[in-house]
UniProtKB/Swiss-Prot annotation:
Homotrimerizes to form a pseudohexamer. This is Bacterial microcompartment shell protein EutL. GO terms for molecular function: cobalamin binding; metal ion binding; structural molecule activity. Keywords: Bacterial microcompartment, Cobalamin, Cobalt, Disulfide bond, Metal-binding. A component of the bacterial microcompartment (BMC) shell dedicated to ethanolamine degradation. May be involved in cofactor diffusion across the BMC. Cobalamin is covalently bound to 1 subunit of the trimer on the concave (lumenal) face in a closed pore conformation; whether this is physiologically relevant is unclear. The closed form has 3 very narrow channels (1.3 Angstrom at their narrowest) per trimer lined by acidic and aromatic residues; 2 ethanolamine molecules can bind in each channel, on either side of the constriction. The record marks 69, 74, 183 as: Important for gating. Cob(II)alamin binds at residue 32. A disulfide bond is seen in native crystals; it disappears upon reduction with tris-(2-carboxyethyl) phosphine, which also reduces the protein's affinity for ethanolamine. It has been suggested to confer redox modulation to pore opening. It comes from Clostridium perfringens (strain 13 / Type A). It comes from the Bacteria. It is found in: Bacterial microcompartment.
Length: 217
């Protein structure tokens, strides 16, 4: 139904206590990166936000994070889902702490929201009040600044991003042009926390307006 939360699901989680030198080289790890934490889930954008939370909760870095092609609905295997993320840290204990923070965030009630009655159109409008090292690097902003993380299907996203930029004192620092790997689109906007929240609200409202009247122009 409209405004329903589409809850994300974690599909697999594993720790590599002592990563092999060959793997470390391929992942371009730093010398202090001794252990890895791996996760897959059925929602990429929530997982990316959760991985950023991990960097604030533990001594870990996000060293790999990629979306799977065509999204979770077209996953080729049981545990592939929509995204794989890899955390790296100096010890298994730190990596475990980072993974626990990731899991806690995914289970906290954050997720895509349905824009219509049959849940066939959904969007992600998450205000990140304080970025960690991962999202701040992705957005090219200082760590700790606020972000509006906005994602929707292609047309809905383009229309709603324009509305968000006009509704609040925010700047676009990263644009996810359609189609992304999962056939969506979106952006990262930055500004004050209140401005980012206003941008999220405007984005959500605009996506819902498209969903309710897709052919009216």
């Amino acid at each position: 139904m409209k405004n329903d939360l589409i809850r994300p699901n974690v599909l697999s989680v594993k720790i590599i206590s002592n990563v092999s030198p060959e793997m470390a080289k391929k992942l371009e790890l730093e010398p202090h990166h001794k252990s890895l934490g791996l996760i897959t889930a059925d929602c990429d954008d929530v997982t990316y936000t959760a991985l950023d939370e991990a960097t604030k909760a533990a001594e870990v870095d996000v060293v790999y994070a990629r979306s799977m092609y065509a999204g979770a609905g077209n996953a080729s295997t049981k545990l592939a889902g929509e995204v794989i993320g890899i955390l790296a840290g100096p010890s298994p204990a730190e990596v475990r702490s980072g993974l626990n923070a990731t899991l806690d965030f995914i289970d906290s009630g954050v997720g895509f929201v349905s824009a219509n009655e049959d849940d066939s159109i959904c969007y992600y409008a998450q205000c990140v009040s304080r970025t960690g090292s991962y999202l701040s690097k992705t957005a090219g902003i200082r760590e700790g600044e606020a972000l509006a993380y906005l994602v929707a299907p292609p047309l809905e996203a383009m229309y709603a991003l324009d509305a968000a930029l006009k509704a609040a004192d925010v700047e676009m620092c990263e644009f996810f042009a359609p189609p992304t790997e999962t056939n969506f689109a979106g952006a990262l906007l930055t500004g004050s926390q209140s401005a980012c929240k206003a941008a999220c609200d405007a984005f959500a409202e605009a996506v819902q307006s498209v969903a309710s009247n897709p052919l009216g122009f």
